[in-house]
């Protein structure tokens, strides 16, 4: 779909200001260290506001009280979001106990937020606690390097596949890819860990002095599970196994979901198949994809800087040939693979070596002690006795992994006693939202705070039409940046203004089709009216086993998005 209008390999023109900022930052140092000592403001100033993102942080404020503070002639209540680097979402119980303690003692909100990129975030870190949080992470073998801005972000890996041995192999590759693509600058260690500056000059052999044109996301996915939503990502390694052993990967490049309202130069896009590669070429190919995007990505317009736009501009075959040239390989034909679902398997699943995995549903990934449901305390109590690890899933849930048979009852009792195993409907299990208000500065409409009650109402609609045992993959994202992955849902809501959303339908359960906008800028009641009509038709007219999204396409209710660069906005 990308060979119709081949364009220039490099976009000429005035570089965006972000490129100036990166070039002048001295390999991401800026004046962050000096800014830390400025007690006159709770935030970071100038370029540092953006540079801290390379160190895994975003500067935010509490939007619920922004107007009140302005009326009092006070600056916004600045606080940082910090996102940990956690390839594949695997975290030890020792590490969990440390982050639980920090969240309780040193953040405004006291919560841990699991994200759909398989890691955790702290919200509400005051400036005085910014350095301590990095030092706490380092003390337990973690960091926040490259979890935001123009780098390869946290690498995802299927959390709980049918073959646990395959997970172990795939997870090791997720870690290797993450480490290989990390920035080499010593700025992180110097600023946060007080390591001395050495005389040698920084070099970035892979990322370059101005790093990537835009954010870059990578996954390792094990079919038939598409839990990590590969089509939301720039670079995807689809595991191919023979006799239960990993032998290589299919490579898919150029997925991405973020758009800008009304900007028809932006669109969501599924990833393109490049071919199959044996394991020994994995790191060379990963580096080649990244460096090709580094050199060819649009540095004049950040709205058109992601890999998906580079592929559309130069053509898939041209990009693929350059990756082959740089990696010194020829891709083999894509090997067969299929996705049959992407939801987590809530409850107990038996793995290898007589070990068990317990997947706990965490609504919106928000871990906090709620009235009657002390989730945060419950996970801490499990961490105190569990000898295995936790795995954070790309559906914002948590797996208590590698539980011996003789410990199952003990772990389950702790989970039940703390409200971690309450019954959940299939519809709620298959719904997700980004954080949005009150902390996200980009939020246009509620998402996390809106979703629970909205799903109550959706369940009412489904009950009315006799399909309560079914589910519709439902996602809410507070703005068109798309962190809630609404652009791969069967029903996707994209925030437009307070209380108003664009309604997208026509995606599928497996996450391989982009949904199209069905109604624009509508209220919750209007959304529910539309769903009432559509679910009613689905209940009566669907074929055996037909999901809601597939039905809306087959019935002609919505046209499928086939070539996003040309038909996403039609």
Swiss-Prot record:
UniProt-listed GO biological process terms: cysteine biosynthetic process; hydrogen sulfide biosynthetic process; sulfate assimilation
Cofactor stoichiometry and binding remark: Binds 1 siroheme per subunit. Binds 1 [4Fe-4S] cluster per subunit.
Keyword set, alphabetical order: 4Fe-4S, Amino-acid biosynthesis, Cysteine biosynthesis, Heme, Iron, Iron-sulfur, Metal-binding, NADP, Oxidoreductase
PROSITE patterns in UniProt: NIR_SIR
Key word Transferase present: no
Keyword Metal-binding: yes
Its EC number(s): 1.8.1.2
InterPro entries, alphabetized: CysI, NiRdtase/SiRdtase_haem-b_fer, Nit/Sulf_reduc_fer-like_dom_sf, NO2/SO3_Rdtase_4Fe4S_dom, NO2/SO3_Rdtase_4Fe4S_prot, NO2/SO3_Rdtase_4Fe4S_sf, NO2/SO3_Rdtase_FeS/sirohaem_BS
Molecular function terms from GO: 4 iron, 4 sulfur cluster binding; heme binding; metal ion binding; NADP binding; sulfite reductase (ferredoxin) activity; sulfite reductase (NADPH) activity
Ligand binding (siroheme): 483
Pathway assigned to this chain's UniProt record: Sulfur metabolism; hydrogen sulfide biosynthesis; hydrogen sulfide from sulfite (NADPH route): step 1/1
Catalyzed reaction equations: hydrogen sulfide + 3 NADP(+) + 3 H2O = sulfite + 3 NADPH + 4 H(+)
Enzyme class, first EC level, given as a word: oxidoreductase
One of the record's GO cellular component terms: sulfite reductase complex (NADPH)
Obligatory cofactor(s): siroheme; [4Fe-4S] cluster
The protein's assembly and partners: Alpha(8)-beta(8). The alpha component is a flavoprotein, the beta component is a hemoprotein.
PANTHER family, per database record: SULFITE REDUCTASE [NADPH] SUBUNIT BETA, SULFITE REDUCTASE [NADPH] SUBUNIT BETA-RELATED
Job description of the protein: Component of the sulfite reductase complex that catalyzes the 6-electron reduction of sulfite to sulfide. This is one of several activities required for the biosynthesis of L-cysteine from sulfate.
Family affiliation: Belongs to the nitrite and sulfite reductase 4Fe-4S domain family.
Protein name from the UniProt record: Sulfite reductase [NADPH] hemoprotein beta-component
Classification lineage: Bacteria, Pseudomonadati, Pseudomonadota, Gammaproteobacteria, Enterobacterales
Name of the encoding gene: cysI
